[in-house]
């Protein structure tokens, strides 16, 4: 299958990328692969969410039935010891650590909602299709990904439900797997992307 853009990963970054691409060029063929059975299934974290990026991506997000509803009403900053804690006044914290006007959200629900927005723009989303292999052109550039075969037993034999993996080719492939993505690690090694870099 051929696309203009193939996105690997259905978290906030991958979904925001898909949305922005379709906003900029509605004619682009964009697909997004997510390894989980549904968008948000592997996003288990809660979050204190600052909306600036969402305000830029979807300025009318409040009108789109977003799951972002609960504003931070109170916060504390504590230094924790073995037996005691020390409270620190929040007004002494740097602005980036203050949560005034931020929201308390479920990242899973945010991702599900972002997926709805992406699909409404024409993004094709394929949950339950983990990308298992990076595909390369002869010149070494990335040309897409392949999904893993389905219906394989523990010994590696094909079951009756076997379906071969598919190749998704893109003029551009975006890897948005998160910091522990196995394909991203392969790219970092192949192209020496971490040489001379601080991991933070």
Predicted regions: what they are:
Residues 42-44, 89-90, 185-188:
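Short, solvent-exposed loop/turn and secondary-structure capping segments
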Residues 112, 117-200:
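Predominantly flavin-linked oxidoreductase catalytic cores and closely associated redox partners
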């Amino acid at each position: 299958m051929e696309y203009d853009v193939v996105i690997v990963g259905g978290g906030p970054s991958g979904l925001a990328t898909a949305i922005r691409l379709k906003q900029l060029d509605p004619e682009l063929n964009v697909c997004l692969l997510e390894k989980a059975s549904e968008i948000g299934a592997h996003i288990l974290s809660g979050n204190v969410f600052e909306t600036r990026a969402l305000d830029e991506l979807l300025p009318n997000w409040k009108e789109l039935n977003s799951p972002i509803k609960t504003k931070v009403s109170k916060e504390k900053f504590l230094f924790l010891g073995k037996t005691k804690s020390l409270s620190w006044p929040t007004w002494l914290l740097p602005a980036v650590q203050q949560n005034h006007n931020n929201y308390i959200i479920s990242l899973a629900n945010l991702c599900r909602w972002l997926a709805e927005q992406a699909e409404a723009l024409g993004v094709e989303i394929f949950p339950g299709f983990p990308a298992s292999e990076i595909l390369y052109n002869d010149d070494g550039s990335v040309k897409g990904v392949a999904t893993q075969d389905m219906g394989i037993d523990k010994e590696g034999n094909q079951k009756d439900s076997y379906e071969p993996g598919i190749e998704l080719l893109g003029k551009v492939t975006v890897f948005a797997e998160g910091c522990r993505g196995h394909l991203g690690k392969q790219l970092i090694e192949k192209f020496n992307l971490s040489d001379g870099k601080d991991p933070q």
